[in-house]
């Protein structure tokens, strides 16, 4: 990539704040959206025990996801709060017999120049041709981006920096007053822009087969636009809830192994996800699950995050997160609870606690026992694991390290998972990397880009079906929508104005 012109000696962060403050964002009317497309599906094929995966061997077979009829969006999937849904970062899985071989992966690119042109064929941003819109959100939109030189598609998030700064942090909200990053002391207070840079610097260096990869970050200081390029996972979420045709127990076991390894990697990097659920788990071409959507994630110091704010999706929230005690609670334990709810969804197609009213749902989560339906019939080992993951007491709830050793996960020791040392390496960022996490470079003065892309809409994973996206304040991933007749070089239709969903408190 070519180098941009020299930037003046002024502090680039202060310069960006000044530039962003000068940007006036007009509110446009919400564009009409079409109905949700039908989703085809059949029962997932029965899984035989996977053979060892070695370089050059066949990838794990991918079951077909279940069909879903049009439905009203429920508390089982609607997130609480309006935060940036940024599926980001990196990836490992399986036992010794189920681990995807690590392949060489290029580092995240830092662009020195953002060049945008509106040609007869399409809107082009550097080497990317922007095509159909595949997602919307509170901070911008997601568009399908085609890199002609690589003959490859990506998901490009176009964000409003002004809205990011207003929210005091990317990709999450600031910690509430009185919250502590560690048990021993208060969290380090960062300026909004410093938090943006620090978290992008970390996300750019995450590298794991069970976390979606951030490819490139582009910045245009003269405009209110920040561009994040991610791997495009066309298969979308592993499941949508509720679901009439859940997974066979063996398939659920393999997917849980992926999730646990990805979660262990994030916790090793001192990140708690806070919104683990089936729609935030994307299916890769290799058949493995990748964690996405870090919209309400938190970084922490010390051994665990001590949280006091509510975030995530109502039906996946842990009892301690919705308690009125006012006490802080463990971030890692929250992720385990949500993973337990997800595992329940995998085998039963619904959440263990369901209600149309949020207060009643909270009461059920805090007070009612987990009930296992008679059908489908599952093993006692699986029930035991679910009950231990859905322990209402976070102090006695099973941890990630013990889940990896559970008999159901390992088939009684026949298929052990790799140790933390084998698949996790701590990501550390220097002050220089934080400073350079996003290049502040001037764009071409003749550029026109789509401010209507940035107007007011809840924005999360780029795989969210259009109809469901209307009903939520923070999107979770759904099937990838690619408009018919839009080829690699086609002209993107005029971008509709988008409205920002109000945050649910």
Curated annotation (Swiss-Prot):
Chain positions covered by the region annotation RP domain: 167-189
Top class in the EC scheme: transferase
Alphabetical keyword list: ATP-binding, Calmodulin-binding, Cytoplasm, Kinase, Methylation, Nucleotide-binding, Nucleus, Phosphoprotein, Serine/threonine-protein kinase, Transferase
Annotated GO CC locations: cytosol; nucleoplasm
Residues carrying Asymmetric dimethylarginine: 78
Region (Calmodulin-binding) location: 438-463
Listed GO MF terms: ATP binding; calcium/calmodulin-dependent protein kinase activity; calmodulin binding; protein serine kinase activity
PTM field: Appears to be autophosphorylated in a Ca(2+)/calmodulin-dependent manner. Phosphorylated at multiple sites by PRCAKA/PKA. Phosphorylation of Ser-458 is blocked upon binding to Ca(2+)/calmodulin. In vitro, phosphorylated by CAMK1 and CAMK4.
Region annotation Autoinhibitory domain: where it falls in the sequence: 435-440
Quaternary data: Interacts with CAMK4 and calmodulin.
Domain comment, as recorded: The autoinhibitory domain overlaps with the calmodulin binding region and may be involved in intrasteric autoinhibition. The RP domain (arginine/proline-rich) is involved in the recognition of CAMKI and CAMK4 as substrates.
Protein name: Calcium/calmodulin-dependent protein kinase kinase 1
Organism for this UniProt entry: Mus musculus
């Amino acid at each position: 990539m070519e180098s941009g012109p020299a930037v003046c000696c002024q502090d680039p962060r202060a310069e960006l704040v000044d530039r962003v403050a000068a940007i006036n964002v007009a509110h446009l009317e919400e564009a009409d959206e079409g109905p949700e497309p039908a989703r085809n599906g059949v029962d997932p094929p029965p899984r035989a025990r996977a053979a060892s995966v070695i370089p050059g061997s066949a990838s794990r077979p991918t079951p077909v996801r279940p069909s879903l009829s049009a439905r009203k969006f429920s508390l089982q999937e609607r997130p609480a709060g309006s935060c940036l849904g940024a599926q980001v970062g990196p990836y490992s899985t399986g036992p010794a017999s189920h681990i995807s071989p690590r392949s060489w992966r290029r580092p995240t690119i830092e662009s020195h120049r953002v060049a945008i042109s509106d040609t007869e064929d399409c809107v082009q941003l550097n080497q990317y041709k922007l095509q159909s819109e595949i997602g919307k959100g509170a901070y911008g939109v997601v568009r399908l981006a085609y890199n002609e030189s690589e003959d490859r598609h990506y998901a490009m998030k176009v964000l409003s920096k002004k809205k990011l700064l207003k929210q005091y942090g990317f990709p999450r909200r600031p910690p509430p007053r009185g919250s502590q990053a560690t048990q021993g002391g208060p969290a380090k207070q960062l300026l909004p822009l410093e938090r943006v840079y620090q978290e992008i610097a970390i996300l750019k260096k995450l590298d794991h087969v069970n976390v979606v990869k951030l490819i490139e970050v582009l910045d245009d200081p003269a405009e209110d636009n920040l561009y994040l390029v991610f791997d495009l996972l066309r298969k979308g979420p592993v499941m949508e809830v509720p679901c009439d045709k859940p997974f066979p127990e063996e398939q659920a076991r393999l997917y849980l192994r992926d999730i646990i390894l990805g979660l262990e990697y994030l916790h090793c990097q001192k990140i708690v996800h806070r919104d683990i659920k089936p729609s935030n788990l994307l299916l890769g071409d290799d058949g493995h699950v990748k964690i996405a959507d870090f919209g309400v994630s938190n970084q922490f110091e010390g051994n665990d995050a001590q949280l006091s704010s509510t975030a995530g999706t109502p039906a996946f929230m842990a009892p301690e997160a919705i308690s009125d005690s006012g006490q802080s609670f463990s971030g890692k334990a929250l992720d385990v609870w949500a993973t337990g709810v997800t595992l329940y969804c995998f085998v039963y197609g619904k959440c263990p606690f369901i209600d149309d009213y949020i207060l009643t749902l909270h009461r059920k989560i805090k007070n009612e026992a987990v009930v296992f339906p008679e059908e489908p019939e599952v093993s006692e080992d699986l029930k035991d694991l679910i009950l231990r993951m859905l322990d209402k007491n976070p102090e006695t709830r099973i941890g990630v390290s013990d889940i990896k050793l559970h008999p159901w996960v390992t088939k009684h020791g026949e298929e052990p998972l790799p140790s933390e040392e084998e698949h996790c390496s701590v990501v550390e960022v220097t002050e220089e990397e934080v400073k350079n996490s996003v290049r502040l470079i001037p764009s071409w003065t003749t550029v026109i880009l789509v401010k209507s892309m940035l107007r007011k809409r809840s924005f999360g994973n780029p795989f969210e079906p259009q109809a469901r996206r209307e009903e939520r304040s923070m999107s979770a991933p759904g099937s990838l929508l690619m408009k018919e007749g839009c080829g690699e070089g086609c002209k993107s239709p005029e971008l509709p104005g988008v409205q920002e969903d109000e945050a649910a408190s």
